[in-house]
Swiss-Prot record:
Its EC number is 1.5.1.5, 3.5.4.9. This is Bifunctional protein FolD. The lineage of its organism: Bacteria, Pseudomonadati, Pseudomonadota, Betaproteobacteria, Neisseriales. The gene is folD. Keywords: Amino-acid biosynthesis, Histidine biosynthesis, Hydrolase, Methionine biosynthesis, Multifunctional enzyme, NADP, One-carbon metabolism, Oxidoreductase, Purine biosynthesis. HAMAP family: THF_DHG_CYH. The keyword Iron does not apply.
């Protein structure tokens, strides 16, 4: 029997609608309109698509968006100066620097320059640290989006064996913290993990984010597991696929996210949610 598909597009639309209603209510209450500043450096086509999607989501929610498209040659000092200006601008609630940045730029230094209360991506060490000590402020968008999806489908991680494959700062590490916060028993797998197939086979909830097409084989999946595929990879024929071998995995899993249409839309919905939250922090 095929797994139930977890429809991130549908869940994200409901969340965007709720955010739009909250923004409209703010305007009725004479509170300022939330504002997101997005910075794109260079002409990376994928980055440009992501930025366009974020602008579209802002329009749907009634959130003001500012766009800064800088040339590939932008220096570290120039980018830091822009971040400083946006930090100081009281009209800007959220700042997002689109990754990856050109190789000559120090991404970590730039992310750390963003004020934690404007860090709507949730990448600042302060925000990751708050999540680690069970006091989240700005939660990383993709991991929080995954938790929202689980909640929407009535999946409670409490007491479940959750396995995260991938230990990146953007997905794997904060995802493990989110699952731990939800009281799952969490295992994180990475490039030094031995017997990966055995670890995957033990998972009640499996979250995979490694950026390698079809990396996790469908036959490894525990029957009845919930599979969340964060990966999105473009194959030579132009088609998109995730990090999990979808066709075989869906015959074993109880629920699974498709790629595209699973986690991706939730990342953007959570970004809008974080921008609204940042605006509420700045009301005082």
């Amino acid at each position: 029997m095929s797994a139930q598909l977890i429809n991130g597009k549908e869940v994200s639309q409901k969340h965007l609608q709720a955010i739009a209603e909250a923004v409209a209510q703010r305007q009725q209450d004479n509170l300022h309109t939330p504002c997101l500043a997005v910075v794109l450096v260079g002409g990376d086509p994928a980055g440009a698509v992501y930025v366009r999607n974020k602008k579209t989501a802002c329009q749907k929610c009634g959130i003001k968006s500012l766009s800064y498209e800088l040339p590939e040659s932008t220096s570290q000092e120039e980018l830091l100066a822009l971040v400083d200006r946006l930090n100081a601008d009281s009209e800007v609630d959220g700042i997002l620097v689109q990754l990856p940045l050109p190789k000559h730029l120090d991404s970590q230094a730039i992310l750390e320059r963003i004020s934690p209360d404007k860090d709507v991506d949730g990448f600042h060490p302060y925000n990751v640290g708050r999540l680690a000590v069970k006091m989240p402020l700005m939660r990383p968008c993709t991991p929080k989006g995954v938790m929202t999806l689980l909640e929407a489908y009535g999946i409670d991680p409490k007491g479940k064996k959750a396995v995260v494959v991938g230990a990146s700062n953007i997905v794997g590490r904060p995802q493990a913290l989110e699952l731990l916060l939800a009281r799952a028993t969490v295992t994180v797998c990475h490039s030094a993990t031995e017997n990966l197939a055995d670890e995957v086979a033990a998972a009640d909830i499996l979250v995979v984010g490694v950026g390698i097409p079809n990396f996790v084989k469908g036959g490894w999946i525990k029957p009845g597991a919930v599979v969340i595929d964060v990966g999105i990879n473009r194959l030579d024929d132009g088609s998109l696929c995730g990090d999990v071998e979808f066709e075989t995995a869906k015959e074993r899993a109880a629920m699974i996210t498709p790629v595209p249409g699973g986690v991706g839309p939730m990342t953007i919905a959570t970004l809008m949610e974080n921008t609204l939250h940042a605006a509420s922090l700045h009301d005082a």
